[in-house]
Amino acid sequence: MPITVPRTIKYAFLSITKEALSNIIKHSNATAVSILMREHPALWQLVIQDNGTLQSPSATEGIGLENMKERIRKLNGTITFSCENGFSIFIAIPKNKKEESDL
């Protein structure tokens, strides 16, 4: 059965994925990228990981990452970044009835 994702979540995940891929190209020497979206009973999850290294410390402080944080905050979600074994973005957005009415 296909998963029906609320528009607000789709838009946020698409925008964040595009920004993450742009950052990987600009700031990493990655040779592989993994993008995983999951539906859990209580939340939506997006995980983006690469196997590269940061070319500059400022790569973790840019406007793109701030925009990601703001987008997820507006959806009452959480976003974390990790620089271990490449760069990773972990996002969780709780499901709620209002979002499901946006389908």
Q: Where in this protein do the model-derived segments appear?
A:
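Structural motif
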Residues: 29, 40, 83-85
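Short C-terminal beta-strand
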Residues: 87-97
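ATP phosphate-binding glycine-rich loop and adjacent ATP-lid/helix-beta elements
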Residues: 57-87
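Conserved short strand/loop->alpha-helix "switch" segment adjacent to the catalytic nucleotide/phosphoryl-transfer site
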Residues: 1-18
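Short helix-loop "hinge" at the ATP-lid/N-box region of the Bergerat-fold HATPase_c
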Residues: 21-28
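Conserved catalytic core of two-component histidine kinases
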Residues: 37-39, 81, 91
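Conserved DxG motif in ATP/Mg2+-binding regions
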Residues: 45-52
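Short beta-strand/loop element within the Bergerat-fold HATPase_c
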Residues: 32-42
